[in-house]
A protein has these predicted regions:
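Basic, polyanion-binding surface patches
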Residues: 1-170
C-alpha cells in the first residue's frame, strides 16, 4: 500500500505519479502489476491509522523527523482484509467498494518521482453502488478524496491528515 501523487484514468489506462523513494515504486518496478483500491468516505480513519508508516525499512530524513515508522504489514495494522488478485499477483482490499487490477506498461522517471502507465485488466465493484451491471450509481458512491492533506468526499470535509498542521504554521 502506498500513496500516489496523482492518478488519472484514461480509457483502459490509469496514469499515476509516485515517489521514487517509496516501497510502492520499488514494488511496481519488480512486480509489474498494481491494484488500485478505491475507498469510500467511511475509510478515512483506517487510512490515517497507517499514514505514518512506510513499507521501506530505510527511511529518508524527512520521514524520520516526522515520526514515521516501518511497517511490514499495513494490512494487519489497518485491519484490512486481503483478497487475492484474479488477473494479477497483487492483492485487493475487501473493504474498498471499487478495486482495479492493472499491469504496468511504462515507467518514466523524473528527478524524484515516476510517471507510471498501467493497463486495466479487471475491475471489481460492490453491487450496492451499481446503477446497472456497467454503471456506478453516483448518488450511492461517496469516494474518499485526499485533497491537500484533507480527507473529503464529493461534497463534505471529513477530517484533516496529521500533516495538515504543517501548512497552517507556514
Amino acid at each position: 500500500m502506498t500513496t500516489l501523487r496523482q492518478s488519472t484514468p484514461l480509457g483502459k489506462t490509469i496514469v499515476i505519479g509516485i515517489s521514487m523513494h517509496s516501497k510502492g515504486y520499488t514494488n511496481l518496478k519488480v512486480g509489474h502489476a498494481a491494484t488500485f483500491n478505491l475507498a469510500d468516505k467511511t475509510f478515512w480513519e483506517k487510512i490515517e491509522k497507517i499514514a505514518k508508516t512506510t513499507g521501506h525499512p530505510i527511511m529518508p530524513d524527512y520521514k524520520q523527523k516526522a515520526d514515521y515508522f516501518f511497517c511490514s504489514d499495513k494490512f494487519q495494522l489497518g485491519k484490512f482484509t486481503k483478497l487475492a488478485g484474479e488477473e494479477v499477483a497483487t492483492v485487493r482490499i475487501k473493504e474498498c467498494p471499487i478495486q482495479i487490477e492493472t499491469l504496468v506498461q511504462r515507467i518514466s522517471t523524473r528527478e524524484d518521482f515516476a510517471i507510471v502507465e498501467c493497463e486495466i485488466v479487471a475491475i471489481f465493484v460492490e453491487e450496492g453502488i451499481l446503477h446497472d451491471p456497467t454503471h456506478i450509481n453516483v448518488d450511492k458512491w461517496q469516494p474518499l478524496i485526499y485533497k491537500f492533506r484533507e480527507y473529503t468526499t464529493a461534497n463534505q470535509s471529513l477530517s484533516l491528515n496529521f500533516r495538515f498542521q504543517e501548512f497552517k504554521e507556514s
